[in-house]
């Protein structure tokens, strides 16, 4: 049993500024996992994510960094386009692709004291999935997409 399990999609982000366009990985679960990985190892952690397996490079880099990651295949990877104005506090965000929602079946084998749900879009986690996990441990939810 892990102390903390973060469940959420790793995103492909297109960042557009007046000066350039870059592509990078992102998402709550991505940043959460790297932050937890910097803490002392007395807290056990795992990440459950879902993305198009042909775009799994961010997962491979996380595994190389020593992060415990389980990749569930999805038809798509969540793909955000973030367009920033000259004033970087102003942006427009578009969803260019959505990954498959997480299911109870994908999470049956997962055991943790705390489940952190890194939601990005409103249908990443059904109420049934949240209730299921709440029956197994404590649940915290990032409210960005919930």
Residue ranges of each PLM-predicted region?
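Conserved N-terminal subdomain of the carbohydrate kinase-like
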Residues: 12-23, 38-124, 128-138
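Extreme N-terminal starter segment of soluble prokaryotic enzymes
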Residues: 1-5
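Short, flexible segments with low predicted structural confidence
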Residues: 7-8, 33
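Short glycine/serine/threonine-biased micro-segments
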Residues: 6, 24-25
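Hydrophobic, aromatic-enriched interface-forming segments
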Residues: 136-146
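Histidine-anchored nucleotide/phosphate-binding helix
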Residues: 27-39
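Short, flexible active-site-adjacent loop segments at beta-strand->alpha-helix junctions, enriched
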Residues: 10, 121, 143-145
